[in-house]
From Swiss-Prot:
Signal peptide (from-to): none
Keywords assigned by UniProt, alphabetized: DNA-binding, Sporulation
InterPro entries recorded: SASP_alpha/beta-type (IPR001448), SASP_alpha/beta-type_CS (IPR018126), SASP_DNA-binding (IPR050847), SASP_sf_alpha/beta (IPR038300)
GO biological process, one term: sporulation resulting in formation of a cellular spore
PANTHER family (UniProt xref): SMALL, ACID-SOLUBLE SPORE PROTEIN A (PTHR36107:SF1)
Any matching Pfam family: SASP
Example of a GO MF term: double-stranded DNA binding
PTM annotation, UniProt: SASP are degraded in the first minutes of spore germination and provide amino acids for both new protein synthesis and metabolism.
Residues annotated as site: Cleavage: E19, V20
Protein name according to UniProt: Small, acid-soluble spore protein 1
Length: 60
């Protein structure tokens, strides 16, 4: 994993990731080696989508 620009955000992002995974029905845990790339990508993609939407709503 690359070095975080804001290390304090790690816990919040982890919580956000688990929330999105739950909503999508993806069984995230401490070990995710048994998940497909599609499953992991759907969680990451949805996270990015929501973060962009949140940012865009702030700048309007």
């Amino acid at each position: 994993m690359s070095k975080s620009l804001v290390p304090e955000a790690k816990n919040g992002l982890s919580k956000f990731k688990n929330e999105v995974a739950r909503e999508l029905g993806v069984p995230f845990s401490d070990y995710n080696g048994d998940l497909s790339s599609r499953q992991c990508g759907s969680v990451g993609g949805e996270m990015v989508k929501r973060m962009v939407e949140a940012y865009e709503s702030q700048i309007k």
